[in-house]
Amino acid sequence: LRRQRQMCIRDRYKNREVVKSVSLSMEKGEVVGLLGPNGAGKTTTFYMITGIVRPNHGRVMYNGEEITTLPMYKRARLGLGYLPQEASVFRNLTVEENIVSVLEMRGVKKKERIATMQNLIEEFKLSHVAKSLGYALSGGERRRVEIARTISTNPDFILLDEPFAGVDPIAVEDIQNIIMQLKERGLGILITDHNVRETLRITERAYIMAEGTILIAGTGQQIANDETARRVYLGDNFKLD
């Protein structure tokens, strides 16, 4: 299996070590969670994997190749997709145009652009809003468009930053199902989100971060039962089911 790995990376911001020593890995065909309280270093870790931030120490490896110094766009070309928490749809373009625009930027020929767009519209159940402008979409519809655009670039791995934020409970379940479909397609998916239960329910394993380090790693149930995870992050009354 191809693997994307981040090994013992560190990052310092304004003389404060935000990420102290983090080692994690992800393989194709699995869903992995990266969770923790505010200020734990999750976002910075995400940024170092995607290339937004360069670590002060350590390496980022992709399929056996070091990519620590590669810019974000080159990592994307290798197959590393990233979906930020902030809304990224083009508000004044239709759903169809949103998807086609990404394909245009990659130099895909027109006939192939149209075919790919139509397939993604159908796969992500966006036919009813295909002609709608980005600003008119609900939170769940917007997320589906953003994921469809990310998939259009044929990544091997996707990093999802707060995919459940700003969507209603029904849409959360919808996005969970989409993530499982992506897994079935063989993609590796790394998720960070404050919706702990929703994340742990769809991950094979997860990492809990606190104060810039990995506190615990394991399955959702192992983490839910861990005393340290409960004390630092989950709370004594946390239950996965």
Named regions from a protein language model:
Residues K111-V129, Q176-M180:
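Conserved ABC ATPase "signature" region
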Residues L133-L137, E141:
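Conserved ABC ATPase signature
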